[in-house]
Amino acid sequence: MIDLSPLVRRLAGTPLASWSQGLQAQLEAKLEKGHGDLDRWRGALQALPTLQPSEIDLVNGLRLDCDCDDATRAQMRQALMGLSPWRKGPFDLFGVHVDTEWHSDWKWSRVSPHLNLKGKRVLDVGCGNGYYQWRMLGAGADMVIGVDPNWLFFCQFQAVQQYLPELPAWHLPFALEDLPANLEGFDTVFSMGVFYHRRSPIEHLLALKDCLVKGGELVLETLVIEGDENQVLVPEDRYAQMRNVWYLPSVPALARWLRRAGFSDVRCVDVSVTSVEEQRSTEWMRYQSLGDFLDPNDHSKTLEGLPAPRRATLLARK
């Protein structure tokens, strides 16, 4: 059983205290429903060797290390491989380099210089396997809660968390919709790589705003197109072979949507075209990746003939 009492204690005396009281029951109800592969993934977690990190680096990447022999390292590698595919990372765990599909460290290096997370209570919506949560702690966050309903990501987070049990990071297998309205308890809320999957983008922005304290900051990272404030791409069917992509606004259009949703001090801090070096298939993620979804003769377009993935990060204040 995953014991959330440390989280409840951490949130005592904060605006999130009453919400925290029901989290254990909510988590156990989710675990009871579970997933067909959950037992297999739990087996991989149980196969991880018992180690105590003597070196922890969450600032320059995500690296844990200690003196361990080749057999222990091989055991670590096999157990982690049992949690494939690994999408966000990379992780360096006791000499095992988990070469994930995404170079999430590149994105973090673009975004983090614009943030001040020191002492902040942070929510990461659609947190994936928690890679960014650890980096947020490395940047000085007081605590980080991540929510993502994907069970494999939940187990991947547990794989790292079992070596960092004292650090104030928690992964809840919840969707944003599972959080109560008007939480108003987080200093910073992240939504990275989620917005374009939402059928109702303004509703998503309002739900994110609900999670923030007054004066809190939203960090929104999403797919965009070039153009003015009236330009928005709505794919006819698929985008880069994804069926669940709904809205790709221009940066000025997205800024307007944020203002319309009641945010202020809206600013874009980064725009970058995603390269096939930043997102690609690896030994740890053997399925198709970005290179398979672009026009082979023109990487500025997707297979559908639409503009290739371009991502922007906008900051806004409640």
UniProtKB/Swiss-Prot annotation:
InterPro entries: CmoB, Mo5U34_MeTrfas-like, SAM-dependent_MTases_sf. One of its GO terms (molecular function) is transferase activity, transferring alkyl or aryl (other than methyl) groups. SUPFAM superfamilies: S-adenosyl-L-methionine-dependent methyltransferases. It catalyses: carboxy-S-adenosyl-L-methionine + 5-hydroxyuridine(34) in tRNA = 5-carboxymethoxyuridine(34) in tRNA + S-adenosyl-L-homocysteine + H(+). Carboxy-S-adenosyl-L-methionine binds at residues 88, 102, 107, 126, 176-177, 192, 196, 311. Keywords: Transferase, tRNA processing. It is an enzyme of class 2 (transferase). GO terms for biological process: tRNA wobble uridine modification. Its EC number is 2.5.1.-. It comes from the Bacteria. PANTHER family: METHYLTRANSFERASE, TRNA U34 CARBOXYMETHYLTRANSFERASE. Catalyzes carboxymethyl transfer from carboxy-S-adenosyl-L-methionine (Cx-SAM) to 5-hydroxyuridine (ho5U) to form 5-carboxymethoxyuridine (cmo5U) at position 34 in tRNAs. Belongs to the class I-like SAM-binding methyltransferase superfamily. CmoB family. Homotetramer. This is tRNA U34 carboxymethyltransferase. It comes from Pseudomonas putida (strain GB-1). The gene is cmoB.
